[in-house]
Amino acid sequence: MVDISRELQVALNTGKVIIGFEETKKAVLAGTPKLVILAANAPKWARGDIEYYAKLAGVPVFIFPGSSIELGAAAKRPHKIMALAVLDPGQSEILKVVEHV
């Protein structure tokens, strides 16, 4: 099993990750992310938007098993993170989380 918190850190340090709902939504509409991660407590409207557009674009969505506060902590950020998009995983194996879903 992939340790999502550790792999997220590696992706943030060696790859390209977009943080924030609006930025993630724009990236999904452009079809550029390789993976979208949503906090488990994301509002239904936000989750519905991202999941709908991600399905159309063929982008996998992973629901982080924790709140937006915990996702922010996993990303070593001092704020909540509802959504993020992995554009380039770098040296991480974060894309393997979708294999276990």
UniProtKB/Swiss-Prot annotation:
GO biological process assignments: translation
Keyword Protein transport: no
Organism expressing this protein natively: Pyrobaculum neutrophilum (strain DSM 2338 / JCM 9278 / NBRC 100436 / V24Sta) (Thermoproteus neutrophilus)
Protein name: Large ribosomal subunit protein eL30
InterPro entries: Ribosomal_eL30, Ribosomal_eL30-like, Ribosomal_eL30-like_sf, Ribosomal_eL30_CS, Ribosomal_eL8/eL30/eS12/Gad45
Family: Belongs to the eukaryotic ribosomal protein eL30 family.
This protein's UniProt keywords: Ribonucleoprotein, Ribosomal protein
UniProt cross-references to NCBIfam families, sorted A to Z: PRK01018.1
Gene Ontology CC entries for this record: cytosolic large ribosomal subunit
HAMAP family on file: Ribosomal_eL30
Gene encoding the protein: rpl30e
Keyword Nucleotide-binding on entry: no
Top-level taxon: Archaea
Pfam families per UniProt: Ribosomal_L7Ae
Gene Ontology molecular function, alphabetical: RNA binding; structural constituent of ribosome
